[in-house]
Amino acid sequence: LNDDLRLALRLADSADAITMEHFRSATLAVRAKADATPVSEADEAVERIIRETLARERPDDGVVGEELGADARGSRRWIIDPIDATSNYIRAIPVFATLIALEHEVGVVSAPALGRRWWASRGDGAFCNGNRIRVSPIASLDDAHLLYDSVKDFDPFGTSERFLALARRTKRTRAFGDFWSHMLVAEGAAEIAIEPSVALWDLAALQVIVEEAGGRFTDLHGDARADGGSAISSNGLLHDAALEAFR
């Protein structure tokens, strides 16, 4: 493991301790942000401890976080989502994770309530709980599993019918959503995951892991980026077919 990945894994350990301490707590404090999405005291505590550690150990690096904003230090940026799927977390649904990325180079997704952690560093492959992972070899939509969050997420973009047309061509669909959809693609359990509206901190860690697992990761325009506002991850073999459905 390189030093940056080792650090990211330690950051994930700290995050897991906080999220599991507050998980299923009857006294968890939750409020609505300006965009009406929820944030809990655990989200803020996780991001604070990660930022404090990075300030000590990588003082020249910048940090972008969902809850506490961005700073412009350095050419390297750490991208943090303290709790991806906060809505699950506050309802005691165990599908949530802390996402930590050194932009383009390192990705860690830690889902302690699921007992799973995925990680990758550029050029070194992708892993889940220490086992190497690889995308599936399925090359036909007829045999593919397609994952997403919610059909209504496509409504503001006028693409719901296009998504449904693609879904009907696949073998099976599941609305797992958030990080888990993309990690299941990286593991080879599914072939395509699609999200029409997501932020950089939702995607930066996922992109590294999916690509290091042999998959392909783009926005809905086909650009290989985590800051395009949307995402398709795939096993690579079915990526063009998924993109074509939205054109």
Language-model features, listed with the residues they occupy:
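N-terminal subdomain of lithium-sensitive/metallo-dependent phosphomonoesterases centered on the IMPase/IPPase/PAP
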Residues: L1-I83, L238-E244
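An extended, acidic
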Residues: R134-R247
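Small-residue (primarily alanine) positions within well-ordered alpha-helices
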Residues: A8, A12-A15, G107, L206, ...
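Solvent-exposed alpha-helices and their adjacent loops that cap or buttress functional pockets
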Residues: R31, A70-A72, R91, W119, ...
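DPxDG-like acidic metal-binding loop motif
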Residues: R73-F127
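Generic detector of well-ordered alpha-helical packing
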Residues: E44, R48, E67, P82-A85, ...
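Residue-level signal for inorganic ion chemistry
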Residues: T19-H22, D43, L54, T86, ...
